Amino acid sequence: MNFHEYQAKQLFAEYGIPVPAGRIASSADEAVTAAKSLGNGPWMVKAQIHAGGRGKAGGVKFCKTTDEVKQAAATMLGTKMATYQSAGVALPVNLVLVTEAGEITKELYLSVLVDRGTRSITYIASSEGGVDIEHVAAETPEKIQTLNVDFVEGLQPYQGRDIGFHLGLEAKQVNQLSKIMISLYQLFNDKDLSLIELNPLAILSNGDLYALDGKINSDDNATFRHKELAAMRDKTQEDETEVLASENDLNYVTMDGNIGCMVNGAGLAMATMDVIKLNGGEPANFLDVGGGATKERVTTAFKLILSSNKVKAIFVNIFGGIVRCDMIAEGIIAAVKEVGVKVPVIVRLEGTNVDAGKQLLATSGLAIIPADDINDGAKKAVAAVTA
């Protein structure tokens, strides 16, 4: 799950990580009130969307007067904003964050993430903040410090200080960085997060470190343990189809192609998309109905796939292990009838009760195209959309 910047900063503050004072606003007048409550300025007005790169898209403004605050907020609120990190999707700006604008002397980068390669929580730090870390890694990799944390020992203060020394910080700042890193480690573990990013972690004119911008992602599989995080979810920032899928315990990701996919099992779903690509087609989605698929879930899955008018064919690829092929076949038949599917449906069944499942499809009276295997199914799906 993704979070807004203001939500990330709320969590940072709870764990003692220094952040500038700020308030959110949903109107230009509220933004002015927020600015006045923060002092005499200057201020930053920042659009709240689930994407980075807001500055280049006009979503971050430096304001010296309350009139400028009002104008900046009015320009952002109620619009949709696309950035180079939003994958071409324009996200609605429903809130702005108004914060104090401190004088920055240096921008750093600091993040915490799960490194699957080393099977550890890993810190990435750089003396080059305020820019994409990917660019720094490609152009000046020597400016990046990494630290893999031992799960048993946890992060130790000396490790944070070592990172600070390598970043060229002064003694006071080294100690501040160490404390921030320990707080981030606690936050990361307490809330089951998958990413924390401070970019920039800035040194202000008084020599202190502040998290001027923050990004966090949490592990969706652990959300049930954190009702306080679930309450922060902003569904307006998410794809409507993906929201509906999550509410029905379906794993769904929208893609750009025209061949809808319904598969049981994430691995088989990815393999299905690969085979479609190998045969010259483009998948319209990733959809894993899971091992506990029911008629109702299959019907919902069809509705999800067909919610996109780009879909010109549907490839159903089921391996019956836990789930029975005859039950899936009944679900497909019921769904096609209920939803009124108008596009070709290609079905490949294999596994438990496969013969019974194929018989049900063959005698259903529906124009369902059978497939012998995954490659045959992919070829027939591609042929259906190119016919």
Swiss-Prot record:
Alphabetized UniProt keyword annotations: ATP-binding, Ligase, Magnesium, Metal-binding, Nucleotide-binding, Tricarboxylic acid cycle
Q: List the GO molecular function terms.
A: ATP binding; magnesium ion binding; succinate-CoA ligase (ADP-forming) activity; succinate-CoA ligase (GDP-forming) activity
Q: What class of enzyme is it?
A: ligase
Q: What is its EC number?
A: 6.2.1.5
Q: In which pathway does it act?
A: Carbohydrate metabolism; tricarboxylic acid cycle; succinate from succinyl-CoA (ligase route): step 1/1
Q: Which residues form the ATP-grasp domain?
A: 9-244
Catalyses: succinate + ATP + CoA = succinyl-CoA + ADP + phosphate; GTP + succinate + CoA = succinyl-CoA + GDP + phosphate
Cysteines joined through disulfide linkages: none
GO BP of this protein: succinyl-CoA metabolic process; tricarboxylic acid cycle
InterPro entries named in the record: ATP-grasp, ATP-grasp_succ-CoA_synth-type, ATP_grasp_subdomain_1, Succ-CoA_synthase_bsu_CS, SUCC_ACL_C, Succ_CoA_ligase-like_bsu, Succinyl-CoA_synth-like
> Per its Swiss-Prot or TrEMBL entry, what cofactor is needed?
Mg(2+)
The note on cofactor binding and number reads: Binds 1 Mg(2+) ion per subunit.
Instruction: Give the residues the record marks as binding Mg(2+).
Output: N199, D213
Task: Please name the SUPFAM superfamilies in this protein's record.
Answer: Glutathione synthetase ATP-binding domain-like, Succinyl-CoA synthetase domains
Q: Identify the residues that bind substrate.
A: N264, G321, I322, V323
| Cross-referenced HAMAP family | Succ_CoA_beta (MF_00558)
Query: What biological function has been recorded for the protein in this entry?
Result: Succinyl-CoA synthetase functions in the citric acid cycle (TCA), coupling the hydrolysis of succinyl-CoA to the synthesis of either ATP or GTP and thus represents the only step of substrate-level phosphorylation in the TCA. The beta subunit provides nucleotide specificity of the enzyme and binds the substrate succinate, while the binding sites for coenzyme A and phosphate are found in the alpha subunit.
Q: What is this protein called?
A: Succinate--CoA ligase [ADP-forming] subunit beta
Q: Which organism is it from?
A: Xylella fastidiosa (strain M12)
